[in-house]
């Protein structure tokens, strides 16, 4: 992007104000990958609320400012100069990250770095031992190759996941129109939209995309769709008048990339390319760097623990080796062997596969995860900042209430009309239905007779679409009904009159009268009426009926609904005979003295599943905050209807109204709910915003700009929350990128929102987030179990080296054997724990505290290493010494035997019975010991995976066979063990030997001990919550 500080950028707010530099004052949270100070400063500057006044200037002032003409446009020569100065009217993409850098990042995560270090150590050890002719030389080489292979394979998988998502800026390019109609030197012609410059005079019509930020000079019946930019679900009227000090609120500015729905417009280009609102959002979205995910932080924390312990143990035994007489090189080999033995080689694959399985499970429930780590992040979420339009609501206007015969009725918009609350034979209803059907320009797209009415495609704006569908549901065949009342003339809706009028002939050929019907802003329609239709009778519109109208109007408006008024007038055949030439310019027909028929209110209704989803979030301790660009009254009404503002909760304004006191006399802390609009947010300093978020549990932000959404997310993060942001519009993309996890809508979502997000809801259903939260929490619990299972065997893999060094026994366990444990036999049970059901209703627990509830905590490490791991070590050594003794090598003889055992030249070493062993025989016996120790670990690990099914409940309560994948994994583990032991050729390939059956039985008592020991631990945890036992032994 160019130098943004040289451009005149703007947002909802005007002027610096007390909070104008809010974003710049706020301290930045540390981001993944960091960034230069200048880049951060530039991003902060972009987030400031900046000022323009083009919408407030007169036409003459605009002509002077941009050296243009409001009738002839720019001169061709000046346009060429401006294009050369400002560049094309296009979004300039940021410098992309090279693909090799993306791939390198996948190879350089926390666990990956640890494994690279381990592989390097193995290669160094290989080089040292090769120079000494050591028999374990090849083992270290194989181990290094295996470690590198694991890192590369998992890195390729991660890179593939990232490769599937596209660059954010590319999605904004999809919004750029290709052609624009421009007037230069008085000539009208079409050019590529990227050739537009400031000061160009352009024309648009319904169906065109706005080619730049336009100051409107003339408009007729123009409406634009700003929903993807501001979040407003209603089509917005555009006219030449300045109606608001804010450029996003005024009617005389149309924004780059929004859609012109109907009417015609002529205007001046005031901003192009990166200087437009959409350009600024693109800069914000691409400038915001991703936060580290909680799972990435947890893995870093875990790597720190593992690396620290590995170095501690390695250094300790390096010193011991030096003290007992080993050479420096030999002691260094021991140090490296211990460090490598401490690295859980299979953990990286386990975490990747577990997250992938959960992502696949979520995909089957309409949640597509772009970033694997986002799976767990959603489970950690404590705050959801949700957009309203299209996320909480259906993004389609629907008739909600009707007022006629002095009663408010709830509209039934279902196909069977079984819930209709009024008499459809009422004469007043028939008249109202006739008016709303005839005074309507919307039409169904042809060929949809078999499609349910709510799902039919309609050509027309949102309000008229809602009225047409309601008419179709209540009348049936609304289009045919219109045909029976042919339209004679029409005045389209415009912002000056605020009404739409049409005149029709009657369906009865014997009745020569005309019917005039009108709809529009209720107060404007009512002022043109002199009578009101009540129970089919026209009554004078006296003060009593005006008060009844006002009461109903305020009641419907207070629900956040859009209200329209309807009226009619029969034109007598004497003054307006058949064939009369109605003239809309001369208005040769009456437009007052009409008969008021009723009111119809519409709203973009909440999705049916949202209230239950919000309630589940509340139960799970997750706070749902609405952040929308829509009107505060509408936002509050929707928030109340879906449960974001709970029943009985009051805002400061509600309390003031109830107590009949001014708002400033109410203690704000007494209000549980709070609705803040964009202008108020602009005047708040950072501490006030944080205090508001802390004080009011139920928050709604309305009329917010994309910059403000970003600031709201940062403020929540500053309070220590893990923030999820949902949205579907272009305006949501910066906040989606900034959030700990961004969730975009798959159907209604813009490409920009989808590319900025970490997760996409294919069904656009907010309720799917609850499923994601549940799966995220479950995978955290199950990852904890998988890691505990994976770490336990580190001790029985490590202790053979410790005994080998300190007691000088023949090596009980080889590197290749460890590799088979880590990457072959144990990987399947470890992954199978990802399929374990939740122990309790995890959606009734509060979100985990990232600082306190760690993936790997002290109780988990202590229990896995020093309790279960110690038992497994005893099992391994028991089996090892049993196998050695049965072959003639009693335990006491084994002590101090290492040097002689490994002597290549000694071919007559005697055992406890006096039998002589050659080096080759001793080597095969060592392979037998490797296999015996391997089998001991595997038998104990079967017990270990069974106890890891639960952390608190008894395994009997959870059930042994509910997780069928785990049962299959155990069977597979045993089969692999048998294959490695008894397959011919294994001694020469992987150092495995056939072993006696009784050596399989030696570790069984230890497996039973592990199971019983853990059941006692769980019983204590359940019986003594909060006790020392619970705190130290519950992980």
Curated annotation (Swiss-Prot):
SMART domains assigned to the protein according to its UniProt record, in alphabetical order: Cation_ATPase_N
PROSITE patterns the UniProt entry points to: ATPASE_E1_E2 (PS00154)
Transmembrane regions: 99-119, 143-163, 300-319, 332-349, 784-803, 814-834, 855-877, 930-949, 964-982, 998-1018
Chain sites annotated for binding Mg(2+): 387, 389, 728, 732
Primary residence: membrane
Domain of life (superkingdom): Eukaryota
Transmembrane helix found in the keyword field: yes
Family membership noted in the UniProt record: Belongs to the cation transport ATPase (P-type) (TC 3.A.3) family. Type IIC subfamily.
PANTHER family referenced in this protein's UniProt entry, alphabetically: POTASSIUM-TRANSPORTING ATPASE ALPHA CHAIN 1, SODIUM/POTASSIUM-TRANSPORTING ATPASE SUBUNIT ALPHA
Protein name, as recorded: Potassium-transporting ATPase alpha chain 1
Organism: Homo sapiens
UniProt gene name: ATP4A
